[in-house]
Amino acid sequence: MKPEETKILASRHLRQEKQREGQAQFKYGSHIHEWFRPKMRKAAQELPAEARIRAIRPAGRKKAKGTVITVGEGRGFVVEHRGEHLVVTASHCLPWLPSGFGIAYSEEHVYRNMLGPLGAAPTVACECLFINPIADVAVVGVPDTQTLSDEADAYRALLEYATPFRITEAPEKSRGFLISLEGEWFGCQVQWMKRIDGPLWVSKPTQPIEGGMSGSPIVSETGNAIGIVAASVMEKGKDAATDEFGASNPRLMRDLPLWLLRTQAMRKQ
């Protein structure tokens, strides 16, 4: 192996810096496709100590059967995998892509100040378990319990009372629900093309789909998660979601990793 190759593999700091620089140069959006860039929140460092970690407790829900939380400057929703709570979100809600090296240190996959209760500044760390920037899907979980025990404890304390969503296949054409910036559920139309195993199209929302909703679940009439809010289509400065097809978004049963979907299939109805 060449000396310069050894240097790249050995220095995790260089790899992290390279990933961040690359992410900063990549810009979402154009005059046609408007990606939901979430609104900035108050920095976690400005919060009083007693507000930095607080558990998410169950709340009354009319449409959904799970917990939605803050992920970075966007959102995510809780699912269960082998007794552990994980968070599904849109990959563009993460600040940078983790290293692709197979021998990377676990801390290279850790995002600090990334999770928090819905509507609050993110203060809790998480580790990236899966990411697909093409489909715009990511799954994060508890940091390593040996090397980052304090961060792992904070993660579990935050999600102690969270209710995991059940993941199911989306109907080919049906009514769905989205959650607004104010935390209210509202209706929309969802559909996908089975013959091409396509993405989930969201159209005809009863309320505007706004920046800051990235990573939120797209929910079926039965309250189960079927997709992820990721993008909106703009035409001449106006949201085109009112047309028949609207915008394409990740469909969970197509875009999530198989190791997660296998355990979802074992959950009871």
Please provide the spans of the model-predicted regions.
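N-terminal targeting leaders that route proteins to membranes or the secretory/organellar pathways
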Residues: 1-46
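A generic structural motif
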Residues: 79, 85-89, 115-117, 136-143, 179-181, 203-205, 219-221
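Active-site region of chymotrypsin-like
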Residues: 51-72, 153-160, 181-268
